[in-house]
Amino acid sequence: MLIYLFEWLSHYFKGLEVFSSYISVRIIMISITSLLITLALGRPMISWLQKMQIGQIVRDDGPQSHFSKRNTPTMGGVLILSSVIISCLLWGDLTSIYLWILILVVIFFGAIGFFDDYLKLVLKHPKGLRAKHKFALQSIFSIVLAIVLFYLLSKNGQMSLSIPFSKSLYIPMGIVIFVVLAFFIINGSSNAVNLTDGLDGLAIVPVVLVAAGLGIYAYIETNSTLANYLLFNYLGNPGLAEVAVFCAAVCGSGLAFLWFNSHPAEVFMGDVGSLTLGAVLGVIAVMVRQELIFFIMGLLFVVEALSVMLQVGSYKLRNGKRIFRMAPIHHHFELKGWPETKVVIRFWIISLILFLIGLAAIKVR
């Protein structure tokens, strides 16, 4: 909305056109806006969650250090998602179909996560939304979205899988391969981030780093000068540049949420936050044709999800024998005696290294 206001005001006041004409300026402004909104609303929301007694449920078989987290306010992901949507409505180009798709993803997956949290925390349903129902909803939406994205992106012929660290190697993709790949990326990312969100601040920093990385790729690939200079395929789809703006909103809101989510956490994001942020990252990766870069930058999420799959598989196939002391893998390290803060910071360091490797692929090609 604001870009239209500044566009009109620029006819009367010189210099204001930078707020409507330059996407780099809007990236800065939306990140600041989402950060400030989250910081401003964080404390009132935490107080409201405490008043409504919407607190974290802690497993009895988990690390003993987690017992102190019991009843810590959760569903704080609503704060992140609201901030992102408001900021996008203020600073985004509302003619961009890609921006609206991302907002729709936030709303849909946010609704799934919210309903799951509501069942568990408010209605005291022990398992929340059944896994098969959750997966069915995610799957139907992901498949429909993948088909829509295929036809939108194929208008400019952007249907090749980009290979990192190569300037000329691209793998052509038809609709079947594209939809299958997008399905696994979106659903896998959504659930992997959800599994990672088990310690204070553990998930939000990798989410911010991956969002920042994908935002940088989106900015480069939708800028013809930068794309040609860095030997990327130019993504000239109208409105696709708004993906970078959206990523900036996620980064700003995520950093502000860390203010409240850092150890000892005052609030957790809950499924409403983690499921949605994971899905959003997957959709962005598909939009900017950087699925493999997303795999590199988000490898921490992949490892967390794989640890659960291996643990469950081992338990079923090896007569109750486990690979890890507890899954996801961050709990394994806790039970080995690592303090929670050490686990979190070391995982952040790993995520930062993966982020830098992903960025290196911009130039090392």
Swiss-Prot record:
Compartments in which it is found: Cell inner membrane
UniProt topology in membrane: Multi-pass membrane protein
Known cofactor(s): Mg(2+)
Positions of transmembrane segments: 22-42, 74-94, 95-115, 134-154, 168-188, 201-221, 240-260, 267-287, 292-312, 342-362
Highest taxon above the source species: Bacteria
InterPro entries for the chain: Glycosyl_transferase_4, PNAcMuramoyl-5peptid_Trfase, PNAcMuramoyl-5peptid_Trfase_CS
Pfam families, sorted: Glycos_transf_4, MraY_sig1
Pathway, per record: Cell wall biogenesis; peptidoglycan biosynthesis
E.C. number(s) listed in UniProt: 2.7.8.13
One GO MF term: phospho-N-acetylmuramoyl-pentapeptide-transferase activity
Function according to Swiss-Prot or TrEMBL: Catalyzes the initial step of the lipid cycle reactions in the biosynthesis of the cell wall peptidoglycan: transfers peptidoglycan precursor phospho-MurNAc-pentapeptide from UDP-MurNAc-pentapeptide onto the lipid carrier undecaprenyl phosphate, yielding undecaprenyl-pyrophosphoryl-MurNAc-pentapeptide, known as lipid I.
Similarity comment text for this entry: Belongs to the glycosyltransferase 4 family. MraY subfamily.
Database matches in NCBIfam families: mraY (TIGR00445)
Protein name in the entry: Phospho-N-acetylmuramoyl-pentapeptide-transferase
Native source species: Francisella tularensis subsp. mediasiatica (strain FSC147)
Gene name tied to this protein: mraY
